[in-house]
């Protein structure tokens, strides 16, 4: 009969009628070693009669696999009526706590049955869902009405059998946790592991997981276990989807599931991906997979809930900076293979951090009057070590899992802002001081400046430290007559001009400090304008104009260029040919480039000729020096200048 129901859907109605009349109720108690019963009345199982034993044997021998498959196929039937009747049979004859399911069937068969049962939620039919919850959460039972029931020893109803396994403080949530939680989670994970390319099949476990959240007793336990597997499955499908339409269909289901999950759980998992020991450099493949998953999650799913923006994203930014610092300061940089893995991880961390900084609003770092903390607490926060900060973040998310309401964040809004700036500045310093970190300098300065723009009220620890590091790097190179890499010089120019141009710029860098470094920077940039060195011409010219944009009224860059062009070894005030050729490069790129974009910081009320004055303040004196070569230079030099003038456009706007 079981086989007929499994293999022939048309016979399931008849099989159901037979089962309703002849299937024994398999709701006996669990064997004594699993019973949690203070009275111990049922520990020996004396009430199992010979008739019940015979009935059980008749449907479960030689093994109960056929019984399970009969129910599984019935629960997956296309007809709602058949699904409903099989669910009724589960509730009345084969509850989750029955010894058949808990003792006699294999774990795979139990997963099969539970997976088939929860599959009915796809239909969104309330009558099916009610029966499913009754089966997963156990039958209702009023303990007081059965406390003195003398007949309970001889005939255990499914209600009393269920409650015999619990103490007086048991609940439906405990029932599900003990009997249904593990097989349900395993079943959903098995569905996710199938890696189907069909959009309908792929999204099925997502929709099931979403529907399970309708009951907190089930969803509250299952969702934390399947959340990351669902997101990983979605990430994998993006690479194997046959078309964008297929991925969009699957992503809609994944996105609906994601939107139903608590923000604290989402970010608890994200922080775990970054800070957890399982994602350490000792397991590089796992670490990179976790970082890529975090990137996918943050770039594809909705991250704009207020709690996410103001509480969780700042903590995640801080977690990323802590991870980057740990990778950079590791003693393993010189070990084979470490630097390449760490560099890839740092690139991924940088892209995620920049994505988050674009998302987070300024109000996330603005103190709230109703949540104000004592300034001494903020001072204590900013003096915490990285290990203490990491522990505080992990403890916060650990507590959030055990609480219905979000606990108090580990840091105030200004406190977390200050620590973020401290760590971001520390990473910039590492790039300046370490030869192995130079490649990340520009990216880290970009991030640091972007963070400063979002944290206007935060205090930067040791604000002069970054300027001092840049100054030392540049002056050491100039004193040693060495040329720094373009990435370092470019980053230094960007850092100085950006820090000076932020609101309340005097907090970070003064105009006097910039003027002190302009001659050194111009000297470095001028070497990149060699005619043969085509690679860096555009970048060097852009940097010179960027320096000019913050100092143009005082002609500082113009004076520095003029000084570099005039050879100190001669008494002549004319530029030699090699310096003139560098000026030709600067002039050409100044003419063809949009140099006006660097004048955005100039006042708009200085009259109609402001652009002309702005340009002239950089190019005039060096141009006069070059033109002087027409009369006082050597024949070759004069010829070179004439050729350059001849090739110039007839007008220069």
Over which residues does each language-model region extend?
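Structural marker for long, regular alpha helices in very large eukaryotic proteins
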Residues: 1-653
């Amino acid at each position: 009969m079981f086989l007929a129901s499994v293999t022939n859907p048309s016979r399931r109605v008849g099989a159901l009628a037979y089962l309703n009349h002849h299937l024994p109720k398999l709701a006996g108690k669990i064997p004594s070693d699993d019973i949690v019963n203070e009275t111990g009345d049922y520990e020996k199982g004396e009430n199992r009669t010979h008739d019940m034993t015979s009935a059980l044997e008749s449907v479960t021998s030689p093994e109960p696999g056929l019984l399970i498959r009969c129910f599984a196929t019935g629960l997956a039937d296309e007809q709602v009526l058949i699904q409903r009747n099989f669910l009724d049979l589960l509730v009345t004859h084969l509850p989750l706590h029955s010894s058949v399911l808990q003792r006699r069937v294999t774990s795979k068969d139990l997963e099969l049955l539970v997976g088939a049962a929860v599959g009915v939620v796809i239909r969104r039919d309330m009558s099916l869902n009610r029966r499913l919850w009754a089966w997963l959460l156990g039958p209702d039972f009023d303990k007081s009405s059965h406390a003195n029931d003398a007949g309970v020893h001889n005939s255990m109803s499914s209600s009393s059998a269920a409650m015999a396994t619990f103490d007086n403080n048991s609940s439906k949530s405990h029932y599900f946790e003990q009997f249904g939680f593990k097989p349900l989670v395993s079943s959903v994970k098995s569905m996710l592991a199938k890696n189907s390319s069909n959009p309908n099949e792929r999204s099925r476990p997502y929709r099931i997981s979403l529907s399970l959240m309708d009951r907190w007793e089930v969803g509250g336990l299952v969702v934390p276990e399947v959340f990351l597997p669902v997101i990983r499955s979605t990430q994998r499908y993006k690479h194997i989807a046959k078309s964008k339409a297929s991925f969009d269909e699957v992503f809609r289901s994944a996105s609906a599931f994601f939107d139903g999950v608590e923000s604290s759980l989402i970010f608890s998992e994200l922080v775990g991906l970054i800070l957890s020991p399982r994602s350490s450099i000792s397991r590089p493949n796992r670490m990179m997979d976790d970082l890529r998953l975090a990137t996918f999650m943050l770039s594809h799913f909705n991250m704009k809930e207020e709690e996410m923006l103001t509480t969780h994203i700042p903590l995640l930014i801080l977690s990323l900076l802590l991870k980057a610092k740990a990778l950079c300061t590791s003693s393993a940089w010189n070990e084979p293979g470490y630097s390449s893995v760490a560099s890839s991880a740092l690139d991924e961390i940088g892209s995620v951090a920049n994505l988050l900084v674009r998302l987070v609003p300024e109000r996330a770092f603005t103190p709230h009057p109703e949540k104000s903390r004592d300034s001494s607490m903020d001072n204590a926060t900013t003096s915490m070590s990285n290990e203490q900060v990491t522990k505080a973040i992990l403890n916060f998310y650990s507590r959030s899992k055990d609480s219905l309401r979000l606990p108090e964040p580990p840091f105030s809004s200004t406190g977390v802002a200050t620590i973020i700036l401290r760590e971001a500045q520390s990473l910039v310093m590492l790039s300046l001081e370490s030869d192995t970190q130079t490649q990340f300098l520009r990216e880290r300065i970009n991030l640091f400046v972007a963070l400063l723009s979002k944290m206007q009220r935060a205090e930067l620890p040791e604000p002069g430290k970054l300027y001092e590091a840049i100054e030392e790097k540049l002056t050491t190179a100039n004193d040693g007559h060495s040329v720094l890499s373009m990435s370092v010089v470019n980053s230094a120019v960007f850092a100085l001009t950006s820090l000076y141009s932020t609101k309340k710029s005097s907090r970070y860098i003064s105009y006097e400090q910039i003027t002190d470094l302009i001659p050194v920077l111009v000297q470095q940039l001028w070497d990149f304008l060699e005619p043969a060195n085509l690679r860096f011409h555009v970048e060097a010219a852009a940097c010179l104009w960027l320096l000019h944009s913050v100092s143009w009224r005082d002609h500082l860059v113009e004076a520095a260029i003029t000084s570099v062009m005039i050879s100190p070894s001669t008494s002549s005030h004319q530029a030699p040919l090699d310096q003139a050729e560098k000026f030709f490069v600067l002039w050409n790129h100044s003419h063809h480039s949009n140099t006006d974009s660097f004048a955005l910081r100039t006042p708009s009320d200085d009259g109609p000729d402001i652009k002309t004055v702005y340009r002239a303040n950089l190019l005039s004196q060096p141009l006069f020096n070059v033109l002087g070569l027409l009369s006082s230079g050597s024949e070759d030099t004069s010829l070179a200048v004439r050729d350059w003038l001849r090739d110039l456009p007839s007008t220069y706007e």
